[in-house]
Amino acid sequence: MLRWIVWRDLMLAWRRRADMLSTVFFFVIVVSLFPLGIGPETQLLRTIAPGVVWVAALLASMLSLGRLFANDYQDGTLEQLLLTPQPLFLVVLGKILAHWIVAEVPLVLIAPLVGVQFDLSRETLWILFVSLLIGTPVLSLIGSVGAALTLGLRGGGVLISILVLPLYIPALIFGAGAVEASVMGTSPSAHLSLLGAFAIVSLLFSPWATAAALRISLE
């Protein structure tokens, strides 16, 4: 069931490639605006790079959260999935995994390329990649709860932002902190460990919370 959900959502996302590309373009544009606006101040660029890239990734991931369950809700597929004998949290976990692959993995892969604009070293670019690889699943996991709670509501995109942005703060602090530690020449292992722990906690609780929120929204 989990594999089928992931494959189905990936195929649907491939048919709507423009949505995926818009997320990537938004991320690239937001990150690229800062070097253009600040100019060739390499030390300043290296200082602000961790926060800029992580905030851009956070905002870009939110662009697609509203579509996480909306399409299946509108065509009735979500209600049919709710009636299947399979546990709902498996359906939710499959959709979260597909969302991460479609919306977050491209950002993780392209982040080191846009990070070059900030004059980051190879080691720091690697830490940037690793921090996003560990941290972006958190964005999809926590974001799914907000998407489920606001399902079918008018102005749901704004409500999702209000609900999930405060919960993203630990991931932002630990992820950007790991990159900043690398920029400063210190070990990022503590920040990466905390980010990994936060990701594990999110994985344990978010699918269940999202499944419960979907049941409430569909009643």
Which residue ranges define each predicted feature?
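Membrane-interfacial helix-loop-helix connectors in multipass membrane proteins
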Residues: 37-48, 112-133, 151, 178-194, ...
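Hydrophobic alpha-helical transmembrane segments that constitute the membrane-spanning cores
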Residues: 93-118, 138, 142, 175-176
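A structural motif at transmembrane helix-loop-helix junctions in multipass membrane proteins
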Residues: 126, 133-165, 215-219
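Junction motif at the cytosolic side of a transmembrane helix
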Residues: 203-219
